[in-house]
Amino acid sequence: AYRSLIVEVNYVKTAGRLVGDTPEERAEYFSDTMLRDREYVASVMADYPEMVRLFHIRIKNALSYFRKIINDTSANIRSIETEINGGEKLGRLLGVVTGSGDTHNGGQSVARLIFENERMIIYKPHSLAIDLAYNRVMEKVGDYSESLGYGRFRLTKCFTAGDSGWTEFIHSSSEPGSDEEIENYHKKLGILSCVLYVLSAGDMHSENIIALKESPVIIDLETVIQPRTVIGGSEVEQNVRDKIINSVKGTLV
């Protein structure tokens, strides 16, 4: 669909129909003026039937996904309030914001659910059984960390039912921590790196780990346990790749 629109933009540009002195102004004219002209849009749809077919699929999938989010959340709201919101009512659902992270299974992606008490809950279109198992492991690891004087790990509250999951929305800490908190954070990050290495986790970069005061918090555990794929190449390339993957560096922490 995007490629079709790029072709169309180039066509109307060559025809001298775009208005504006800069690329930004011409792009704005195309989106805000030309795409609001019903006759022009009808002609574009007639010229690019495959694009229209893809649009129909995307719209159908989006509507189906929104229905699933609302239905699943409504059916499990009491458990969500208990496990994530301390038993307090979340109130009415005011909005659903999608488009965060990768898409799966017909365009489904992580969504933010906005409730009337200004509380946000994260909806994920898959089971969070791994997240719950990870939390149980980290509770035990937290005992060790606490015994060393570093404090316990901050874990994400979550609930799962069937092929859906909900987690609390965690804001990263914007205030600088004390020297002790910063020291504890880095020591905990070292412990966490060890755990992730043992689990053969990967993709644990800065977008998946939030700094919350003195504790690193993983907010995306999709790759905490993952299969190792065999990639072709020379023996030297494979050896180098294996050494990286089978090391702490392979976790990307």
Question: Where are the model-predicted features located?
Answer:
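Conserved ATP-binding subdomain of kinase catalytic cores across diverse folds
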Residues: 1-201, 206, 215-217
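Catalytic activation segment of kinase domains across protein kinase-like and atypical kinase folds
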Residues: 175, 200, 205-253
